[in-house]
Amino acid sequence: MKEIKAYIQRCCVNKVVDELEKEHAPGITIVEIHPVGYGYEPNYFGFQQHDAYKRYSYLRIVKVEVVCADRDVDRFAETIRRLCSTGSRGDGMIFISDVSDAIRIRNGDRGEQALTQPKETTCH
């Protein structure tokens, strides 16, 4: 199994999620983040260095996470790349990591079986 972590512009999220759902991605997590550091240009938005808080609040970056079978990782990663690429700085990054196991809390299913859609969902 693999985990895809894609850091993309917020404006791309809906089309990425829609397409990954069409491709039957087993589960998608979206997290809004505030990046600091690598790849960030201090004056990208024209603010002075002392305006650090204001500068970071304008970055619209979202992390998309998908855990999937090895056979699907290239297809899902390419879908994200294709939909988010403008050819400009700030398009984002995709990271792919190995996942040693997955365990469904409800019934103890493990591995790829845990990634399949559960038959029923009940929240207590």
What are these regions, as identified by a protein language model?
Residues 1-124:
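Positively charged, small/polar-rich N-terminal and surface patches that mediate targeting and assembly
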